[in-house]
């Protein structure tokens, strides 16, 4: 086996870092384009079954343009330009004392010129979310609590994230594997 | 020099497979937007009445007594055209819309249903009451008097993979809220 030179090792490590930073930059670009701090989230509970199962990936959008009220935006326009939160939209929101965001459907919407209040409910839940809110909150606020609106989804891919969280050993196996692959991989001459 | 080994063949195969799968998913995702299915409904909802009275629900607004409304309606809507090979569920909901001094737009879901097949999407219902347990219909100002609402059927199409899409039928006539007079005990 050819002896691994120091320079070659550095080149391999640099290549791995390039791959990782490209993924990170892609994620941040998506975050910027959608005005959403977490444009991709994983479903962790069953409250939105049967539409979303545990382990599904959701793609979010948090842009809030003002539309001409008479014109209903098409799905294409919603995806390209974003749209305000509407009744029946599935939103991701966070509450002050809950670390994990919640994905539920808007069932009550109150809009005025400078403020939008709403109440959500999980499709698989019997009652709405008011009982989950802290005492000081009766309505969710569009600006303060809503992280994004669900635009699309992909099944099963999020299970990888859940497994990595539930079984921490898998993290080290994966990182170790990546490291070994980087060092062992030969460059074609 | 390229070494032709099982490892190289396997690597090439899975690399090509992942590329093909990626483009297949992209095609499925975007065809759902380009080839979107529409439904035109002709007055799907007829509302008999909307009544309200003071009541208390343990799970609604911290068990505080306030006015809650209930709606009685007929529905005749065929949403089976929304289904194609990539459709997973259609969620339909009846939305009450009205204006108040404080909010130009108030929209409240009063009834909903999850449709799991095209056959189930042909809906015909008579004298149906809105689901007041799942969707307690209260007003932001806690005052229904003098207000009128229109009722619209909305739907969300959940795909097996790709973008969600939305739709709505035409609204009903404006229906005023009536107070239920109860005998004192």
Curated annotation (Swiss-Prot), chain A:
GO MF terms held by the record: peptidase activity; serine-type endopeptidase activity
Reaction(s) the record says it catalyses: Cleavage of hydrophobic, N-terminal signal or leader sequences from secreted and periplasmic proteins
Nucleotidyltransferase recorded as keyword: no
Glycosylated sites: 114
One GO biological process term: signal peptide processing
Gene Ontology, cellular component aspect: endoplasmic reticulum; signal peptidase complex
Active site positions: 47 (charge relay system), 104 (charge relay system), 129 (charge relay system)
Region entry C-terminal short (CTS) helix, spans: 173-184
InterPro entries linked: LexA/Signal_pep-like_sf (IPR036286), Peptidase_S26 (IPR019533), Peptidase_S26B (IPR001733)
Family note: Belongs to the peptidase S26B family.
Coiled-coil stretches: none
Lineage: superkingdom: Eukaryota
Organism annotation: Schizosaccharomyces pombe (strain 972 / ATCC 24843) (Fission yeast)
Localisation: Endoplasmic reticulum membrane
Assembly and binders: Component of the signal peptidase complex (SPC) composed of a catalytic subunit sec11 and three accessory subunits spc1, spc2 and spc3. The complex induces a local thinning of the ER membrane which is used to measure the length of the signal peptide (SP) h-region of protein substrates. This ensures the selectivity of the complex towards h-regions shorter than 18-20 amino acids. SPC associates with the translocon complex.
Function noted in UniProt: Catalytic component of the signal peptidase complex (SPC) which catalyzes the cleavage of N-terminal signal sequences from nascent proteins as they are translocated into the lumen of the endoplasmic reticulum. Specifically cleaves N-terminal signal peptides that contain a hydrophobic alpha-helix (h-region) shorter than 18-20 amino acids.
Keywords annotated in UniProt: Endoplasmic reticulum, Glycoprotein, Hydrolase, Membrane, Protease, Signal-anchor, Transmembrane, Transmembrane helix
Side Lumenal, residues: 26-189
Residues that span the membrane, as ranges: 9-25
Protein's recorded name: Signal peptidase complex catalytic subunit sec11
Enzyme kind, highest EC tier: hydrolase
Chief place where the protein resides: endoplasmic reticulum
Primary gene name: sec11
Cytoplasmic topology ranges: 1-8
EC number(s) given by UniProt: 3.4.21.89
Membrane topology: Single-pass type II membrane protein
Domain-related comment: The C-terminal short (CTS) helix is essential for catalytic activity. It may be accommodated as a transmembrane helix in the thinned membrane environment of the complex, similarly to the signal peptide in the complex substrates.
UniProtKB/Swiss-Prot annotation, chain B:
Primary localization: endoplasmic reticulum
Ranges annotated as spanning the membrane: 13-34
Pfam families: SPC22
Membrane topology: Single-pass type II membrane protein
InterPro entries attached to this UniProt entry: SPC3
Compartments where located: Endoplasmic reticulum membrane
Domain of life the protein comes from: Eukaryota
Keyword Transmembrane assigned: yes
Coiled coil: none
Gene Ontology CC, one term: endoplasmic reticulum
Glycosylation site list: 148
Subunit field text: Component of the signal peptidase complex (SPC) composed of a catalytic subunit sec11 and three accessory subunits spc1, spc2 and spc3. The complex induces a local thinning of the ER membrane which is used to measure the length of the signal peptide (SP) h-region of protein substrates. This ensures the selectivity of the complex towards h-regions shorter than 18-20 amino acids. SPC associates with the translocon complex.
Family: Belongs to the SPCS3 family.
The protein's name: Signal peptidase complex subunit 3
Organism: Schizosaccharomyces pombe (strain 972 / ATCC 24843) (Fission yeast)
